[in-house]
């Protein structure tokens, strides 16, 4: 016992010495560690929590964009058994040449995703001094992959043109941010909508964490009720529908243990609790031969395990870098896609960034320190991402995990950027953190973001209805932007009566003044005649 106390004291003294040294150094002064009442180890812990909850985007984004075929085309299809040259249908089958191209593109996109996240996060930390991580956002990637380019290039716009659209939209958004219009637009959003955004985004994240493809698998699709309780031992790999063994999924119960570890740690104020749950579940899932392993004894599992055992691997981007073309910009579909992306960015990402600032306690009188630089970085990162071959890069709502761990300065964002840099070399490890390890943390993020619901004035019908619609639509429409738009729309509609009444009173006052002046003039004229 005495030895343990000595070790604990030594560790505590060493940590204090490290924190004091960093705080007094150039790094500490640059990031204002003492002014914001934080330490290096706190920022490191916050960055680790943020990165671990964001890391899933590396593989998810790569897989979604690869579904579009990316830079692969019919020219990559190989001729099978000396038959005639392959036709357009070769991209939909299992053509060896095309599949090899898809495999290469996925590796390109993994590196591109990490690189764009690194650049965005570093810029946010160094230029805005805010603890927010950036990465290619969910939503825009699916829109580009499945609606614009189409599955394996089946849409009307090529991947090269799609990246040109992202580039142009990023430049336009950067201009709006540079002119200071983005911050003003954010402050025009009613306070009740801003507060509801925090709650709605939390529910959105928690909903993602509960799903099969990105979380613990507690909920899944149902033909009658849309969603239902699942956690099934057998599920459809495509739809996620339950095929049998409801509530008997081993990975779900392992995720529950991870969630309880995180919850207990937070309940006892244990620093790093968000990390411990993820690390525990991941470590168990890396053991082969168990029911919860991420490496089953299948051809795919063996392939993933062989890649995992490499530990260190760096892939040089071969095809997506600079894959930009403006040749199709005469098509009307191009401008529809541009308008859609710009609209989502203007309302969605602005709301997310402002909400993160509110959750972190940075907002005072509707503004926050580093706001202008933050908006520029958030917009400019999309320009960088498009050049690398990925979609819109934006502030991630998972940054709230780092805020919960005490992140208060840009040092958190810088460390997140360095983690993404490291992930480019440790892709075999990072890409094999299972979804059921990340899911519990996403649910916990939803729990902590629910706290601001108490600040909404539920006794005021206009604010209550606005907040409820905003919160409800974010998870149910699977869109943060939809919730914001609906909330603002409801608020404006309910405010119209007061506006019309105010205008009517003003016009009535003007009429009375005119009549009074007219009567005075008439009286004077009468006196003069007499």
From Swiss-Prot:
Membrane topology value: Multi-pass membrane protein
An annotated GO BP: adenine transport
Any one Pfam family match given in the protein's UniProt record, by short name: Xan_ur_permease
GO MF, one example: guanine nucleotide transmembrane transporter activity
Keywords: Membrane, Transmembrane, Transmembrane helix, Transport
Inactivation phenotype: Resistance to 8-azaadenine and 8-azaguanine, and, to a lower extent, to 5-fluorouracil, but not to other toxic nucleobase analogs. Deficiency in the uptake of adenine and guanine.
Family to which the UniProt record says this protein belongs: Belongs to the nucleobase:cation symporter-2 (NCS2) (TC 2.A.40) family. Azg-like subfamily.
PANTHER family named among the record's database cross-references: ADENINE_GUANINE PERMEASE AZG2 (PTHR43337:SF13), XANTHINE/URACIL PERMEASE C887.17-RELATED (PTHR43337)
Protein name: Adenine/guanine permease AZG2
């Amino acid at each position: 016992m005495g030895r343990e106390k000595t070790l604990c004291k030594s560790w505590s003294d060493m940590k204090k010495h490290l924190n004091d040294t960093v705080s007094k150094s150039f790094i500490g002064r640059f990031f204002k560690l003492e002014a914001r009442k934080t330490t290096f180890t706190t920022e490191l812990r916050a960055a680790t929590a943020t990165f671990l909850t964001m890391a899933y985007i590396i593989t998810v984004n790569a897989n979604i964009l690869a579904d579009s075929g990316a830079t692969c085309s019919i020219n990559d299809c190989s001729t099978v058994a000396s038959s005639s040259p392959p036709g357009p249908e070769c991209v939909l089958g299992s053509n060896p040449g095309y599949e090899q191209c898809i495999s290469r593109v996925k590796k390109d996109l993994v590196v591109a995703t990490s690189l764009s996240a690194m650049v965005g996060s570093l810029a946010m930390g160094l230029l805005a001094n805010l603890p927010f991580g950036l990465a290619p956002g969910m939503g825009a990637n699916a829109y580009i992959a499945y609606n614009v380019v189409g599955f394996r290039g089946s849409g009307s716009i090529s991947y090269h043109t799609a990246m040109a659209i992202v580039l142009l939209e990023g430049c336009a958004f950067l201009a709006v941010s540079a002119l200071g219009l983005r911050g003003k637009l954010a402050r025009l959003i009613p306070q009740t909508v801003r507060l509801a955004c925090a709650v709605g985004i939390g529910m959105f994240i928690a909903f993602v964490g509960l799903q099969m493809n990105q979380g613990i698998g507690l909920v899944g699709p149902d033909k009658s009720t849309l969603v239902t309780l699942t956690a099934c031992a057998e599920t459809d790999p495509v739809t996620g529908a339950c095929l049998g063994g409801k509530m008997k999924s081993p990975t779900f119960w392992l995720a529950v243990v991870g969630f309880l570890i995180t919850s207990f740690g937070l309940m006892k104020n244990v620093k790093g609790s968000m990390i411990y749950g993820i690390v525990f579940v991941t470590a168990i899932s890396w053991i082969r031969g168990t029911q919860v392993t991420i490496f089953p004894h299948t051809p795919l599992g063996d392939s993933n395990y062989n890649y995992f055992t490499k530990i260190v691997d760096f892939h040089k981007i071969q095809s997506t870098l600079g894959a930009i073309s403006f040749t199709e910009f005469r098509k009307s579909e191009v401008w529809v896609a541009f308008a859609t992306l710009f609209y989502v960015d203007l309302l969605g990402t602005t709301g997310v960034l402002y909400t993160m600032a509110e959750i972190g306690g940075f907002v005072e009188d509707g503004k926050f320190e580093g706001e202008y630089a933050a908006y520029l970085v958030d917009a400019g990162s999309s320009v960088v991402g498009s050049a690398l071959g990925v979609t819109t890069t934006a502030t991630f709502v998972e940054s709230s995990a780092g805020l919960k761990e005490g992140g208060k300065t840009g040092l958190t964002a810088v460390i997140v950027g360095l983690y993404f840099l490291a992930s480019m070399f440790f892709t075999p490890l990072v890409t094999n953190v299972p979804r059921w390890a990340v899911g519990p943390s996403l649910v916990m993020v939803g729990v902590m973001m629910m706290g601001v619901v108490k600040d909404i004035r539920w006794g005021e019908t206009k604010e209550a209805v606005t907040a409820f619609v905003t919160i409800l639509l974010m998870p149910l429409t699977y869109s943060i932007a939809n919730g914001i738009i609906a909330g603002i729309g409801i608020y404006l509609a309910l405010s119209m009566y007061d506006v019309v009444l105010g205008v009517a009173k003003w016009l009535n006052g003007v009429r009375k003044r005119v009549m009074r002046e007219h009567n005075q003039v008439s009286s004077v004229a009468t006196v003069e005649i007499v």
